[in-house]
Amino acid sequence: MPLSTVALIFGGKSTEHEISIISAKSIAAVIDPFRFQVLPLYITHEGKWFTGEFAENILQLDLAEMLRSTSLDATGNTLRQMAMHTGQQGFDFDFFKAGIDLAFIALHGSYGEDGRIQGLLDTFGIPYTGCGVLASAVAMDKALTKLCVTEAGIATAPGITILSSEYFADPKSTQKSIEEQFTWPVFVKPASLGSSVGISKVHHIGELIAALETACRYDSKILVEKAMQGREVEVAVLGNNAPEVSITGEIEPGSEFYDYADKYIHNAAKMYIPARISPELQEQVRKDALRAYKALGCRGMSRIDFFVDETSGTIVLNEVNTIPGFTDISMYPRLFAASGLPFNELVEKLLQFALETPSGARS
């Protein structure tokens, strides 16, 4: 029986390019070689697609160590230089039509989690891991996510959405509006980025301008939210029609909030599995995670993040991540490992769920 060819798609044009490579490397290492032939498919920062030897070489890099020992910019420049001097031709899209049986999407952030790659694969009739176009696009936009889950009865942080064009047209009016509607601190964040890129915690009016301008560099839609008290609790969800929900996990940031450097460079955050909350709150968080998953029309997988205040018993949804990290420090695979599902079996299930869903039949 011939092996099924899995296109492992990684890299991409987002700010999470390097993390995508680390995730893909972990995934490639555990895909069953007796069932699947892995075709690494690397997308450069500039959007050029490569397979073959060059993509294989990218997967062999120790990106985690490069990020720790140099910087994000330096690591990105190294990858760009490799792409410029590979001497290899870009990917032939005609191969999509006949040479790929399914795709494992390991792209994070823009162009990977926002429905664009999903739409391309639907067009070619190729099954793929994770959510479909609509669920991906909505979950990527934190403002739209808030609207959807609020409709389903799930609490979110008080917040407002600001367009960058509105801010630059009248900065003082925007600042005044925020000051009138919120008490400090607040979070200012791009609506559609992951890994805490572009997010600032603002403690007083003097920090607001810099935070808004930072967020505007990354997105045309900005979300301002009240900073919530409590523990950062995460839940992993897996499946299509009958999703499984993992036990809870907790992130204790090494700095004031769990930012990109904390996650991937300094490795300063602490993880607790299960989360250090009461059994009753743990069960409610798991129920809310499943409700959010269904409300957004998710399939395959998602990691759903909350703030939990044990004193008041308040549970507030923070965000839904439809392609969570698969690095060795990522919470999603750790949560399922702690729930009794090893990493290799998790990847196997994701591939199986992809094959269960005909292309174009998911939301």
Swiss-Prot record:
EC number, UniProt record: 6.3.2.4
Catalytic reaction equation(s): 2 D-alanine + ATP = D-alanyl-D-alanine + ADP + phosphate + H(+)
Cofactor note: Binds 2 magnesium or manganese ions per subunit.
Protein's UniProt keywords contain Kinase: no
Sites where the protein binds Mg(2+) 1: D305, E319
Alphabetized InterPro entries for the sequence: ATP-grasp, ATP_grasp_subdomain_1, D-Ala_lig_Van_CS, D_ala_D_ala, Dala_Dala_lig_C, Dala_Dala_lig_N, PreATP-grasp_dom_sf
Main location: cytoplasm
Binding-site list for ATP: 179-234
PROSITE patterns: ATP_GRASP (PS50975), DALA_DALA_LIGASE_1 (PS00843), DALA_DALA_LIGASE_2 (PS00844)
Record GO biological process: cell wall organization; peptidoglycan biosynthetic process; regulation of cell shape
GO molecular function (one): ATP binding
Location of the protein in the cell: Cytoplasm
Cofactor(s) needed for function: Mg(2+); Mn(2+)
Annotated pathway: Cell wall biogenesis; peptidoglycan biosynthesis
Claim: Magnesium is one of the keywords in the record: yes
UniProt keyword annotations, A-Z: ATP-binding, Cell shape, Cell wall biogenesis/degradation, Cytoplasm, Ligase, Magnesium, Manganese, Metal-binding, Nucleotide-binding, Peptidoglycan synthesis
Ranges of residues in domain ATP-grasp: 146-352
Cellular component per GO, a single term: cytosol
Transmembrane stretches, start-end: none
Alphabetical list of PANTHER family matching this protein: D-ALANINE--D-ALANINE LIGASE, D-ALANINE--D-ALANINE LIGASE A
Function: Cell wall formation.
Matches recorded under NCBIfam families: D_ala_D_alaTIGR, PRK01372.1, PRK01966.1-4
Family: Belongs to the D-alanine--D-alanine ligase family.
Protein name as it appears in the record: D-alanine--D-alanine ligase
GN (gene name): ddl
